[in-house]
């Protein structure tokens, strides 16, 4: 009995000490700093295949519209009306979808931390998927001739008809 109490006390002290330690978050190194402000960099980012126009064209051509439900935010009654129009091959109302793609352009020109934020979740998901499939690199931002990480966002709007 005395031995089991001693064992329990030792276990409590051990786990209390092990899990009671404050974990300190390491400060980011200079290479982990992500710049957001174009005023802070000497050379801004650019897409290697045709600049922003080339990037938008590549994004549009790789987007699978079948994976986007433009009407997902509509009330059920409206969805049923639209489905009926589709089944009768009648024109359906067009929908404008918006999202903002955010990502980090790494010093090697690749993208990381890809996120799409907007109201339509299927559109967000497809934009994230599409962006992850793009293997062409960016021309990274530079400060004093050194390539740096740069936070970038691209607003996207698409009309679904």
Regions found by a protein language model. Give the residues of each.
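Hydrophobic h-region of N-terminal signal peptides that target proteins for export
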Residues: 11-19
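Charge-biased low-complexity segments
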Residues: 4-8, 20-161
